[in-house]
C-alpha cells in the first residue's frame, strides 16, 4: 500500500493560483514566451484564426467595460450571458476557446521543462501512434485472449470538472470551467445530457479534447499501475492521475478483500503480464492467460468505472475474444493472428511419418467496405463506390486538383502499406485516380475517357505511389537487404494525418 501511495504522489507546487488571474493580466504574454512556448499554440487555434488569445482578452475587457456580463441568481436562465442568443453563443465560445488555450500552458511548461532537463517524461505518453502496429505485430503472436474496450464518455459534466480538480487547486478557475460547461447546457436547453458531450465535441474541440484526455488518463491510471506491478521491467512512460482524496473510501466498494490486503490485487494480475494499447476512445488488452483471467480484468474495469466515475459500463462495451478466431477492428485495420500449418514428411529407416508444424502470423486486412464509406463521406463517391465529381474543387487549378488527389492516394497507400493483403488499398488508390479524372473532366466539360487519353503518362506519374520508388532512394536495388524489403511489409511511421477510418466516431 505504501508503494501505491508513493506511485500516486504528485508535485503540487504549481497547482495553486492556476490560471484564472492570468486571463485578466497583461503578463500572460511574458509568462508564456519566457518559458519557451510555441507561439502558434497561443496565437491561434488550428484551422480557425478568429479564436486568438488577443481577441479573447479584448473581448473580456469589452464585456466588463460595457457591463455585458451580468450574473443573476433569480434569473430563469442562471449564469447566462445576457443579450441576443447569437451574440451570447459567440461570446461564450470565444471565451472558452481562450480558456482552453490558457489551461494548456502549465502542462505544456511541464512537458518542455522535462524535455529540457532530458528526463523521462512520466506524465505524458510520447509513443508514436504508428508504432502501435509494429508493437501488435511483435506481441500478439504470443498471446491467447484479447479484451476489446470502448472507453465511455463521462455521464455528467461534473465528472469532467472533478477529473481536473485533483490536479488544479485553484477554485476560481474550476468555477469558471463549470460556468462554461453549464452555459452550453443552458443556452441549448433542447440538448439532453447524453447529447451534451457530443455537442461539446463539435462546438469546442480544444476544450473538449483537453478535458477528455484527462478523463482517459484517469481511467487508465490505476490500470497502468497494476500493469507496472506485474512487469519485471517497470514502465515509466505513464503518469498516475488518480483521484487521491476519496480513492481509499471508494476502494471498499470494489471487492471487500481489496481493503484487507492490497497485495491480493497485485496477485490477481501478476502473471501473465497483459499488454495494453489504446488509440483515442478504443483500447485493447491482450494476455497469454486464460479466459478466467480476462473475465477478472473485465469485471475489475466495470467495478472501477462504477465506483471511480459513477458510470455503469455496459457489458457490450467490453468483449473477450480468442485471438485465434477473432479479428480486431482497430485504427482502420482488421487484424488477427492467423495459424499457418505445414506438413513435413519424415522417414527414419523403414518407417515414415508426417509432422505437422503450426506457426502464427499477424495478419492485417484492409476493410474495403468502411474504406469506401470513408471516401463516400468525403463526397468522392457514392455508397456503392461509383465516382462523383468533386464540384467544390473545380475552381482550383489543374495542378492543385492533381496535388490534392495525389496526396490522398499516397496517404491511403502508405497508411495501409503494412497490410498483409494490400490489394484493397491498391484498388482504393486506383479508384482515387478515377475520382480525380471525373473532377477534371467535369471542369473541362469533357468525358473521363477523353481526358485520360489526353494526359496519359503525366496523369499516372502524379499518382505514382509504389513503395519501390521510395525504397530506391534509400537502398540500392542490387543489395540483398533491399530485395528482402521490397517483398516484405513496410510500416510508414512518419504519417501525421490519419484518415477518419482510424478515428472513433
Curated annotation (Swiss-Prot):
A Pfam short name: MatK_N
InterPro entries cross-referenced by the UniProt entry: Domain_X, Maturase_MatK, Maturase_MatK_N
| Protein keywords | Chloroplast, mRNA processing, Plastid, RNA-binding, tRNA processing
Which Gene Ontology CC terms are recorded? chloroplast
Q: Where in the cell is it found?
A: Plastid, Chloroplast
Entry keyword annotation includes ATP-binding: no
Domain of life of the organism in this record? Eukaryota
Name of protein = Maturase K
Taxonomic source organism:
Blitum bonus-henricus
Record gene name: matK
Amino acid at each position: 500500500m505504501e508503494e501505491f501511495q508513493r506511485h500516486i504522489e504528485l508535485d503540487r507546487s504549481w497547482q495553486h493560483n492556476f490560471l484564472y488571474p492570468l486571463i485578466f493580466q497583461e503578463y500572460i504574454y511574458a509568462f508564456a514566451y519566457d518559458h519557451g512556448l510555441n507561439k502558434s499554440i497561443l496565437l491561434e487555434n488550428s484551422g480557425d484564426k478568429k479564436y486568438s488569445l488577443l481577441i479573447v482578452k479584448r473581448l473580456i475587457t469589452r464585456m466588463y467595460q460595457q457591463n455585458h456580463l451580468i450574473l443573476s441568481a433569480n434569473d430563469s436562465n442562471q449564469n447566462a450571458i445576457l443579450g441576443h442568443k447569437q451574440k451570447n453563443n459567440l461570446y461564450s465560445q470565444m471565451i472558452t476557446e481562450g480558456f482552453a488555450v490558457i489551461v494548456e500552458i502549465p502542462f505544456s511548461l511541464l512537458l518542455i521543462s522535462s524535455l529540457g532537463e532530458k528526463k523521462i517524461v512520466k506524465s505524458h505518453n510520447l509513443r508514436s501512434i504508428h508504432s502501435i502496429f509494429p508493437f501488435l505485430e511483435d506481441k500478439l503472436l504470443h498471446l491467447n485472449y484479447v479484451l476489446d474496450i470502448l472507453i465511455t464518455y463521462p455521464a455528467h459534466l461534473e465528472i469532467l470538472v472533478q477529473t481536473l480538480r485533483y490536479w488544479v487547486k485553484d477554485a476560481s478557475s474550476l468555477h469558471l470551467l463549470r460556468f462554461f460547461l453549464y452555459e452550453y447546457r443552458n443556452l441549448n436547453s433542447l440538448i439532453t445530457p447524453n447529447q451534451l458531450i457530443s455537442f461539446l465535441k463539435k462546438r469546442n474541440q480544444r476544450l473538449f479534447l483537453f478535458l477528455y484526455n484527462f478523463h482517459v488518463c484517469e481511467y487508465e491510471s490505476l490500470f497502468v499501475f497494476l500493469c507496472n506491478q506485474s512487469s519485471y521491467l517497470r514502465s515509466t512512460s505513464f503518469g498516475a492521475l488518480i483521484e487521491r482524496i476519496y480513492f481509499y473510501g471508494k476502494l471498499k466498494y470494489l471487492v471487500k478483500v481489496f481493503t484487507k490486503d492490497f497485495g491480493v490485487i497485485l496477485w490477481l494480475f501478476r502473471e501473465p503480464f497483459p499488454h495494453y494499447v489504446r488509440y483515442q476512445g478504443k483500447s485493447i488488452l491482450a494476455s497469454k492467460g486464460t479466459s478466467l483471467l480476462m473475465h477478472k480484468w473485465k469485471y475489475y474495469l466495470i467495478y472501477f468505472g462504477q465506483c471511480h466515475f459513477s458510470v455503469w459500463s455496459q457489458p457490450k462495451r467490453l468483449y473477450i475474444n480468442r485471438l485465434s478466431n477473432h479479428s480486431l477492428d482497430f485504427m482502420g485495420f482488421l487484424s488477427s493472428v492467423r495459424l499457418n500449418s505445414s506438413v513435413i514428411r519424415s522417414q527414419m529407416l523403414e518407417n515414415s511419418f508426417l509432422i505437422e508444424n503450426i506457426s502464427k502470423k499477424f495478419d492485417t486486412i484492409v476493410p474495403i467496405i468502411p474504406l469506401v464509406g470513408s471516401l463516400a463521406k468525403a463526397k468522392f463517391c457514392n455508397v456503392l463506390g461509383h465516382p462523383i465529381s468533386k464540384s467544390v474543387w473545380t475552381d482550383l487549378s489543374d495542378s492543385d486538383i492533381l496535388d490534392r488527389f495525389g496526396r490522398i492516394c499516397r496517404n491511403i497507400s502508405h497508411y495501409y502499406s503494412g497490410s498483409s493483403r494490400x490489394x484493397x488499398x491498391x484498388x482504393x488508390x486506383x479508384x482515387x485516380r478515377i475520382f480525380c479524372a471525373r473532377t477534371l473532366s467535369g471542369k473541362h466539360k469533357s468525358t473521363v475517357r477523353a481526358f485520360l487519353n489526353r494526359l496519359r503518362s503525366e496523369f499516372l506519374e502524379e499518382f505514382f505511389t509504389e513503395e519501390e520508388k521510395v525504397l530506391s532512394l534509400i537502398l540500392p536495388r542490387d543489395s540483398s537487404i533491399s530485395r528482402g524489403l521490397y517483398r516484405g511489409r513496410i510500416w510508414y511511421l512518419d504519417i501525421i494525418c490519419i484518415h477518419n477510418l482510424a478515428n472513433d466516431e
